């Protein structure tokens, strides 16, 4: 069979047709001759190529096939996603009029459609498809054509991958638990996030019942719809609105001078808009009361309008970071006594 690789040129492109071909037809030649014969395509060559590309389908199913035909009587076959009804009909106790399949069968069908739709395997996704093979084998026998090295199939590496995935999920759960607990706060990015400065900042903020912890940049990007957030991102927040208001009031009255410059994200209109506040509250505080919603909205609106041209915390928080050890210890002790 001749394969022409230049189908994207208009001078060779003639026609694109979609044919619904049964996998096992009693007389495939007579079925395809009226269609392909119009363009001078050899039916037997087409069937041979079709059989090779549909070898992984082991039961009767209608396969939508896109055929690209050139002016020099060559063709290219592209398999489309098979009909879901045709695949479901091969499951036990399935009826089109009265469906009787369990949730696991629906899950396996969704995976099957994904494999048909993505007929290529990425190096990063190979481990995922290996783990799904046992589910897919219950519905259809799929030939994945994987060139997996022996090291990838070793049990020790598989266990290591499972541990890494478990660690990643645990870290995400801890992060969201902290965000749900500290419902009022803001995101900041530090140019310099040394351990000593951060530990000191955590200690001083803890006196005011304020928490600070590291967050992922893609979390803030997903909230605001922007993709330019990167760097050392932290969330500063409190469990109570009054603690957060007291925090903003205190830092707005101080004078500063330091080379440790935190940067406030220039979200501007996105941050002060009502949709962002609603999204922020729906993610981190689904049970917030209406009065708290408007209070937090007013805080963000006033805060950004006043400091939108400044680097927040560059002028408002650095006093917590430029004290020497002796002064910091004295301040912490005095604050503890007052409280």
Swiss-Prot record:
Xref: Gene3D superfamilies: Ribosomal protein L11/L12, N-terminal domain (3.30.1550.10)
Keywords in alphabetical order: Mitochondrion, Ribonucleoprotein, Ribosomal protein
Transmembrane segments: none
Biological process according to GO: translation
UniProt record similarity statement: Belongs to the universal ribosomal protein uL11 family.
Major place of residence: mitochondrion
Protein name listed in UniProt: Large ribosomal subunit protein uL11m
Highest taxon, organism lineage: Eukaryota
Gene that specifies this protein: RPL11
A GO CC term assigned to this protein in UniProt: ribosome
Family matches, as HAMAP family: Ribosomal_uL11
Origin organism lineage: Eukaryota, Amoebozoa, Discosea, Longamoebia, Centramoebida
Annotated GO MF terms: structural constituent of ribosome
Subcellular localization: Mitochondrion
